[in-house]
């Protein structure tokens, strides 16, 4: 696996979430540190893993409110780091321009709806050839500036909902990845004999399905995103499968 920023943040956030469920207090606070670091590496990847881990964390912690204190502190730290980051870098106009330009450009490149636009749908300031160069990751910043990128982003965001649902047809390219996700969910559902766990897994499966559909409506299900979705499922599978050995489950060194 190529440990680029997205995948690295996913692994680090996963380790932190697992530690948050441990009984030892020091382990939970170490988990806070890992999740905060993951959010600093790649916020969206950490958020995706955290979102998928949230149901199992709540399932394990139940109504033990004291164990939620590290999680509350963790969320406050993440919000504080994001606010500090914005405060420091937003004061530099060149950096602010660069960050917003490339953020919007990346969103357009990753959005299948951007490839549906016809020449007549483009803003008047954007030439069709320049737009095609933008979609091929070689934009001309003099021809498509931040103002044009904003207009294109708004245009792509206004694509009708029924056209966004048609993007689900593209998911056939990821048939293997989706089959793995479904197999894990079916395995978890079939191997549990506990009614509470069964209902939880049904709800969790629906939650994952809705999330996959949501991601696919305005983005490509890339391998790095798939890995970030697969990791929490593996952990959930490990935690909820029946343990008939009587031995304490071990996560590995430090976990």
Q: What do these predicted regions represent?
A:
Residues 69-76, 244-255:
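Signature aromatic-anchored transmembrane alpha helix within multi-pass, membrane-resident enzymes
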Residues 166-197:
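Hydrophobic, aromatic-rich transmembrane alpha-helices
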Residues 89-166:
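Membrane-proximal stem/loop segments at transmembrane-domain junctions that anchor or position
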Residues 28-43, 53-54, 73-83:
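Membrane-interface alpha helices of multi-pass inner-membrane proteins
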Residues 48-76:
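Perimembrane helix-loop-helix junctions
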Residues 47, 51, 219-242:
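Hydrophobic/aromatic-rich transmembrane helices and adjacent perimembrane loops
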Residues 30, 195-215:
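Transmembrane alpha-helix segments characteristic
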Residues 13-27:
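Membrane-interface transmembrane helices that cradle and orient dolichyl/undecaprenyl
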């Amino acid at each position: 696996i190529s440990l680029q920023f997205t995948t690295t943040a996913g692994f680090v956030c996963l380790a932190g979430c697992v530690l948050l469920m441990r009984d030892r207090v020091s382990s939970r606070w170490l988990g806070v540190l890992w999740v905060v670091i993951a959010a600093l590496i790649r916020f969206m990847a950490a958020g995706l893993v955290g979102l998928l881990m949230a149901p199992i964390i709540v399932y394990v912690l139940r109504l033990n409110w004291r164990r939620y204190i590290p999680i509350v502190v963790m969320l406050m730290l993440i919000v504080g780091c994001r606010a500090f980051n914005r405060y420091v870098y937003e004061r530099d106009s060149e950096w602010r321009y660069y960050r917003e330009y490339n953020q919007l450009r990346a969103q357009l490149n990753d959005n299948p709806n951007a490839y549906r636009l016809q020449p007549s749908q483009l803003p008047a300031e954007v030439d069709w050839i320049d737009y095609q160069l933008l979609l091929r990751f070689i934009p001309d910043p003099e021809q498509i500036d931040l103002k044009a990128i904003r207009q294109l982003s708004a245009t792509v965001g206004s694509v009708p909902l029924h056209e966004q649902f048609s993007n689900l047809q593209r998911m056939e390219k990821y048939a293997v990845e989706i089959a793995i996700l479904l197999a894990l969910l079916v395995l978890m559902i079939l191997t549990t004999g506990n009614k509470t766990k069964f209902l939880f897994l049904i709800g969790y499966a629906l939650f994952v399905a809705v999330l996959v559909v949501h991601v696919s409506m305005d983005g490509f299900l890339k391998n790095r995103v798939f890995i970030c979705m697969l990791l929490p499922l593996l952990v959930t599978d490990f935690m909820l499968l029946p343990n008939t050995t009587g031995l304490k489950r071990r996560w590995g060194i430090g976990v």
